[in-house]
């Protein structure tokens, strides 16, 4: 099988830089074309030793296009670029929101997918010190990714999977599911709940410091317990030992004092749709 021709649109931005740097590491597998509109982005591409390609030329040559643009611009920009794709092209977006909100422009003769990183898990063994310091992924730290095929050809989507595994490399597993299921992972699982709780934990460290507790001690105590308790609750400790009776009481109190009684409604389809609409258009909140 020949090399896959991959264009990265938005290659001078944050995610465009990350993904294109990794794809460039495998020239024997990928012919890489970098597309960027902004002056700063073009300069960033040149500073990394590459040359930008005009978008018309890139789209004409591409087997797969990586659409590394901000989520809030996917609807607007896909309406410009998708009509220019050659028939049969694979088109990868990096977040499911625009697809779930039906703002992504589609074509019947092209294949569309979502590819999003899980980021390195603290339960995943890394091979080197440098890999353990990669908190985001894609810079040495192994991670999993999630993907969906929005529509299109299975063989072309298989190419999209290979592209995604390299642009987020090193990748352990690529879990394929629906775009809606990815959206329940983010924003519902990791942003509405996870990030909110973790932000509150960081604020709680500040409260500990106000009470004379050294910040280093509070951070160590908090993160150590997060590691231990998440291992316990998620089944990573052999035998699934129960937490202490006192901890169970504290969890019950926390559910009353910290969590809303109806917090699980964030898993309702209606809530998800309103959350996504608000995230894509914060000037028109739906919830």
Swiss-Prot record:
Pfam family name, one: PGDH_C
Listed cofactors: Zn(2+)
Entry binding sites for Zn(2+): 116, 186
Binding site for NAD(+): 13-15, 36, 71
Signal peptide range in chain numbering: none
Pathway assigned in UniProt: Carbohydrate metabolism
A GO molecular function held by the record: metal ion binding
Keywords annotated in UniProt: Carbohydrate metabolism, Metal-binding, NAD, Nucleotide-binding, Oxidoreductase, Zinc
InterPro entries, per the entry: KARI_N, NAD(P)-bd_dom_sf, PGDH_C, Semialdehyde_DH-like_C
Catalyzed reactions: D-apionate + NAD(+) = 3-oxoisoapionate + NADH + H(+)
Listed EC numbers: 1.1.1.421
Biological role: Involved in catabolism of D-apiose. Catalyzes the conversion of D-apionate to 3-oxo-isoapionate.
Similarity remark: Belongs to the ApnO family.
UniProt-recorded name of the protein: D-apionate oxidoisomerase
Species annotation: Blautia hydrogenotrophica (strain DSM 10507 / JCM 14656 / S5a33)
Encoding gene per record: apnO
């Amino acid at each position: 099988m020949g090399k896959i021709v991959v264009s990265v649109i938005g290659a001078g931005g944050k995610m465009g830089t990350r993904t294109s740097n990794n794809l460039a590491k495998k020239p024997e597998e990928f012919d890489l074309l970098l597309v960027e509109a902004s002056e700063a982005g073009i300069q960033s591409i040149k500073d990394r030793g590459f040359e930008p390609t005009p978008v018309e030329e890139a789209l004409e040559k591409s087997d797969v296009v990586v659409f590394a643009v901000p989520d809030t611009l996917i609807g607007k920009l896909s309406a410009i670029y998708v009509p220019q794709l050659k028939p049969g092209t694979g088109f990868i977006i990096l977040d499911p929101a625009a697809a779930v909100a039906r703002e992504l422009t589609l074509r019947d003769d092209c294949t569309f997918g979502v590819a999003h990183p899980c980021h390195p898990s603290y339960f995943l063994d890394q091979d080197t010190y440098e890999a353990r310091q990669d908190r985001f992924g894609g810079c040495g730290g192994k991670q999993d990714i999630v993907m969906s095929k929005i529509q299109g050809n299975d063989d072309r989507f298989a190419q999209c999977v290979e592209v995604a595994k390299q642009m987020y490399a090193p990748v352990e597993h690529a879990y394929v599911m629906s775009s809606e299921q990815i959206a329940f992972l983010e924003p519902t699982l990791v942003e509405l709940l996870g990030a909110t709780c973790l932000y509150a934990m960081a604020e709680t460290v500040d409260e500990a410091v106000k009470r004379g507790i050294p910040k280093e001690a509070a951070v160590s105590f908090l993160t150590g317990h997060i590691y231990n308790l998440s291992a316990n609750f998620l089944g990573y400790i052999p035998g699934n030992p129960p937490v202490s009776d006192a901890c169970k009481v504290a969890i019950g109190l926390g559910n009353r004092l910290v969590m809303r009684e109806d917090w699980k409604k964030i898993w309702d389809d209606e809530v998800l749709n309103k959350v996504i609409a608000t995230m894509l258009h914060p000037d028109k909140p739906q919830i």
